[in-house]
Amino acid sequence: MFTLKKSLLLVFFLGTISLSLCEDERNADEDDGEMTEEVRRGLMDSLKGLAATAGKTVLQGLLKTASCKLEKTC
């Protein structure tokens, strides 16, 4: 009976450890996904800001040219 208890305790202990390791790996994988999403979001925000700045610059140039031609001061 003592040998059976020892074996069951060993199986339970090893199962608990392997389950714990699997959960740690799963949590690590989920964390990597969150970091990637944050990096992508940061990259998209940077690109949007760059596009907005470029758009403003182009529009300002077009407006200056149009006002110059309308006022005939070019």
Swiss-Prot record:
What is the scientific name of the source organism?
Pelophylax fukienensis (Fukien gold-striped pond frog)
The answer to whether UniProt assigns keyword Disulfide bond to this entry is yes
Q: Which cysteines form disulfides?
A: C68-C74
Subcellular location(s): the record lists: Secreted
Bilayer-crossing regions: none
**Expressing tissues:** Expressed by the skin glands.
> InterPro entries under this entry?
Antimicrobial_frog_2 (IPR012521), Frog_antimicrobial_propeptide (IPR004275)
Tell me which GO cellular component terms the UniProt record holds: extracellular region
Per the annotation, which location comes first and is thus the protein's main one? secreted
Q: Which controlled-vocabulary keywords does the entry list?
A: Amphibian defense peptide, Antimicrobial, Cleavage on pair of basic residues, Disulfide bond, Secreted, Signal
Keyword Ribosomal protein in the entry? The reply is: no
Which Gene Ontology BP annotations are present?
A: defense response
Protein task: Antimicrobial peptide.
Question: Signal peptide span per the entry?
Answer: 1-22
**Propeptide feature ranges:** 23-39
The record's similarity note reads:
Belongs to the frog skin active peptide (FSAP) family. Brevinin subfamily.
What name does UniProt use for this protein? Pelophylaxin-3
